[in-house]
């Protein structure tokens, strides 16, 4: 299975929870805990776990990462 999703979350447990909810297969996603992990992505979809509107550096992250596609999800 090819890597398709980058889950931007506070903890690995949150990333695993989101992957489970979305029925993702192992190898289809990876956990990203900081903006440095997003920089340079060329493909795939970034999924955010949590409340993106409360993330203070969201504009900086998007600009530096040059993300192709981003879906903002609020999962509790």
Give short role names for the model-derived ranges.
Residues 1-76:
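Short, flexible loop motifs at catalytic/binding sites
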């Amino acid at each position: 299975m090819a890597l398709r999703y980058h889950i931007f979350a506070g903890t690995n447990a949150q990333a695993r929870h989101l992957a489970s909810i979305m029925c993702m297969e192992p190898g289809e996603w990876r956990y990203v805990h900081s903006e440095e992990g997003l920089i340079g992505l060329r493909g795939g979809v970034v999924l955010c776990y949590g409340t993106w509107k409360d993330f203070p550096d969201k504009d900086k992250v998007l600009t530096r990462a040059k993300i192709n596609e981003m879906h903002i999800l609020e999962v509790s």
